[in-house]
């Protein structure tokens, strides 16, 4: 058996276009000048003239990013009342960084196997979302595995059913499975309850929703919008450099496909977010090139990207780690520099998110002094990171947010998904609960009794 590919096998060698230095890059960053890829590499590495991270230089980068954050968005730290309703773990793409998926064949009726995963019907999704909305939640995020029975809608299912080689388009009929996930439009429509904001259908899912057809991404996202989709999460980006994708997700949507899908979503009037998943086989040059592609995309979509979310790779339980392709994830220094350089480089995206799911509360708060200004959401369920070995739970109450944000002297602010609606929260005026949703009245989302089992997990 051949040994697994490692970072050392990557042939990528970035050659700077101009003479660069850390000091030049930092001077440009402090002045608010637009940074180049070469500048970003200098800042991410704290200088290509040194080995490892220079702690003094790192602090100067973080300080510059924190000043930029204050200039752009002030002292507010935002968060949203949201639910994660991931529909299915069934998938057969085989991304090496993922432990969310379960092999799709284990969900089939005739295998005699008991799957460790789950699939929800549209009616189950509606019930889950309706309950969350009644508690004050006003955003539902849904990112799922690429279930072979998924089709965009009824017309798409007819096309897939008639395909001469269904295996070639990764399709099996719903009857082959214990549970039918319905279609993508069924699920979106089911989750569109009582005015809740539906944030779903990544470019990868849109790619799956057009397989076997000549439909454009505009066709796909137009139908999803009609079904109730409001905004598109920019996950599945990972690193937008093909040689990295060839290692970590060779069966996944390409860089160009991801960018095309995101532009299409914006073209039909859907809002966007964007991400980077770093800390595996890529290097700082790959990260910098990714940032450049996101910045260029934001220009093409006329500012439709509301936030950028750096996602630190959680390595435990993933094939990359178990096959010795990587020995761990990003260091704390790398995490802080990723947030900071994202703030300094992405001069056309106002909001940078700190993910407590990835970093934990203490380090997540530190990121709010490294350039980040958003602190995610309540997240009633977070299966993806938890299944990969994440250690930081899956729920934060508004009271948690008020305590955490106030502890660093910043202003806690409830926001809508698109950041257009905001409510400053007075730390001296409890109880703390959402008020921006269709059924929000300030009541905490979970009672103390309901929350107790989560604290015991």
PLM regions with names:
Residues 41-44, 81-83, 113, 142-179, ...:
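Glycine-rich, proline-tolerant flexible connector loops at the mouths of alpha/beta enzymes
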Residues 140, 145-150, 198-211, 240-242, ...:
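Conserved strand-turn element in the central/C-terminal portion of the radical SAM core barrel
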Residues 71-77, 136-138, 192-198, 228-231, ...:
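Short, well-ordered coil/turn segments that N-cap beta-strands
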């Amino acid at each position: 058996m051949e040994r697994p590919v490692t970072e050392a096998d990557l042939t990528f060698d970035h050659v700077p276009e101009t003479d660069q230095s850390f000091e030049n890059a930092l001077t440009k960053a402090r002045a608010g000048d637009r940074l180049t890829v070469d500048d970003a590499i200098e800042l991410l590495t704290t200088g290509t003239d040194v080995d490892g991270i220079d702690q003094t230089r790192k602090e100067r980068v973080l300080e510059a990013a924190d000043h930029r954050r204050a200039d752009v968005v002030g002292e507010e730290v935002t968060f949203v009342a949201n639910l994660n309703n991931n529909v299915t773990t069934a998938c057969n793409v085989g991304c090496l960084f993922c432990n969310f998926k379960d092999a799709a064949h284990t969900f089939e009726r005739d295998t005699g196997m008991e799957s460790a995963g789950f699939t929800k019907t549209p009616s189950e999704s509606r019930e889950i979302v309706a309950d969350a909305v009644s508690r004050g939640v006003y955003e539902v995020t849904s990112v799922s595995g690429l279930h072979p029975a998924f089709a965009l809608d009824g017309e798409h299912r007819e096309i897939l059913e008639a395909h001469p080689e269904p295996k070639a388009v990764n399709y099996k009929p719903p009857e082959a499975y214990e549970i039918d996930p319905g279609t993508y439009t069924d699920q979106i429509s089911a989750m569109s309850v009582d005015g809740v904001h539906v944030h779903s259908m990544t470019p990868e899912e849109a790619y799956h929703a057009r397989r076997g057809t000549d439909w454009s991404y505009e066709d796909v996202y137009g139908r999803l919008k009609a079904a109730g989709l409001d905004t598109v999460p920019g996950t599945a980006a990972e690193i937008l450099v093909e040689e990295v994708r060839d290692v970590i997700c060779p069966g996944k949507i390409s860089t160009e496909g991801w960018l095309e899908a995101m532009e299409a979503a914006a073209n039909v009037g859907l809002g966007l977010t964007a991400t980077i998943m770093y800390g595996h086989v890529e290097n700082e040059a790959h990260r910098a090139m990714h940032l450049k592609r996101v910045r260029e995309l934001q220009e093409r979509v006329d500012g439709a990207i509301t936030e950028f979310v750096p996602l630190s790779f959680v390595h435990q339980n993933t094939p990359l780690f178990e096959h010795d392709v990587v020995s761990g994830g990003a260091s704390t220094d790398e995490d802080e520099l990723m947030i900071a350089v994202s703030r300094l480089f992405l001069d056309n995206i106002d909001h940078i998110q700190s993910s407590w799911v990835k970093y934990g509360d203490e380090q997540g708060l530190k990121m709010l002094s490294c350039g980040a200004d958003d602190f995610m959401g309540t997240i009633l369920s977070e299966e993806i990171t938890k299944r990969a070995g994440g250690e930081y739970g899956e729920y934060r109450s508004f009271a948690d947010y008020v305590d955490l944000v106030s502890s660093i002297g910043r202003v806690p602010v409830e926001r809508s998904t698109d950041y257009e609606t905001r409510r400053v929260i007075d730390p001296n005026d409890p109880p703390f609960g959402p008020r921006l949703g269709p059924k929000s009245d300030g009541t905490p989302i979970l009672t103390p009794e309901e929350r107790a089992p989560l604290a015991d997990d």
